[in-house]
């Protein structure tokens, strides 16, 4: 799975086996190795994060801090998404 970056022991990554049609820009977050059905965060047009689910059961304060970092690096996330998937649509 394409790793976008790491935040401490957590991976922030794209799941390469996305559905067709391609879902809007989002990242998954998991402790240790990437895995299917990990925590999912949508990236909005304005670079904000919206929590889709917390399947990885990341503690709330940790997740909130990670989402702030992802927002600060959202342009990097979007560019990497476009580079990997060839297009970028947004949830909102």
Residue ranges and their predicted role:
Residues 4, 16, 71-75:
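Alpha-helical interaction segments
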Residues 8, 32, 47, 83-86:
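Residue-identity detector for glycine
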Residues 1-14:
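Negatively charged, low-complexity tracts enriched in Asp/Glu with abundant Ser/Thr
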Residues 19-60:
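A short, structured beta-strand/loop element
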Residues 53-92:
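Well-ordered alpha/beta subsegment
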């Amino acid at each position: 799975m394409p790793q976008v970056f790491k935040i401490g022991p957590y991976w922030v990554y794209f799941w390469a086996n996305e559905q067709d049609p391609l879902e809007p820009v989002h990242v998954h977050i998991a402790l240790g190795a990437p895995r299917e059905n990990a925590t999912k965060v949508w990236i909005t047009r304005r670079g904000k994060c919206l929590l889709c689910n917390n399947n990885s059961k990341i503690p709330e304060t940790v997740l909130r801090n990670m989402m702030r970092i992802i927002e600060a690096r959202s342009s990097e996330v979007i560019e990497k998404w476009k580079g990997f998937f060839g297009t970028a649509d947004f949830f909102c």
